[in-house]
Amino acid sequence: GMSEEKRSPGLGVGLMLVCAVLWSTAGLFIKSVPWNSMVLAGWRGLAATLTLWLFMRKMHYRVRIDMRTVLIGLCVSGTSILFLIANRLTTAANAIVLQYTSPVFLVVLSMLIFRRRYRAADYVTVIITVCGIALFFFDQLTPGGMLGNILALIDGVTMGGVYLFTGESDEERRLSGIFLGLAVTTAVGIPFTVAYPPEVTVTSVLAVIAMGVLQL
């Protein structure tokens, strides 16, 4: 209804700030675990999937599968995997900053898909962010850094998609979508363990579990 429309921008910004803090700690965690990106995505996904599953059981939510939850799921798994790969290729700071382009893509996608109208302030934010991204790109002209930047930008798009599709859904569908995304990430990532056996140390295992639980 109207009240939800009114309330969402402020709430969204708050959520993004919380996310910002979590993702920055993620950047540090990722650097501390010397595993292959896909292996890391898979095991972290497993920890997150189990945490969310326990939470959904407690709340008596079912995992619903429909067009919207699948879209959320694809965006969630895209975001997790791209963030990890980008983090390896570019500096953690770059990957995180570029991932914060997601509000820009959120505004653009929702204008295209939901024909949303925005306030002037939102457009200003978009323009400033775009200028910031341009600076980042010209700063990192090394091929690896560049590829990492591009992946981190696509990551911004998928993250914008997560906010876009979850923003329009009720709690059960929102969590179902996130659950599907984490499950996909787990299924895609864990098989890489065979090709790239990780160094299993207490530190790395704890870091992966912490990442899985916190990243929710």
Could you tell me what each predicted segment is?
Residues 1-39, 71-74, 82, 131, ...:
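Glycine-/small-residue-enriched transmembrane alpha-helix faces in small-molecule transporters
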Residues 22, 57-94, 98-99, 131-135, ...:
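Specific transmembrane alpha-helical segments of multi-pass solute transporters/efflux pumps
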Residues 24-25, 42, 46-50, 104, ...:
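Small-residue-rich packing faces within the transmembrane alpha-helices of Major Facilitator Superfamily
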Residues 39-42, 46-47, 84-116, 155:
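Specific alpha-helical transmembrane segments that line the substrate/conduction pathway
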Residues 40, 174-178:
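Juxtamembrane helix-start motifs in multi-pass secondary transporters
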Residues 52, 74-76, 108-111, 118-138, ...:
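Hydrophobic transmembrane alpha-helices of multi-pass small-molecule transport proteins
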Residues 63-69, 96-99, 115-135, 139-149, ...:
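Loop-to-transmembrane alpha-helix entry segments
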Residues 85-90, 138-146, 168, 195-202:
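Membrane-interface helix caps and helix-loop-helix hairpins in membrane proteins
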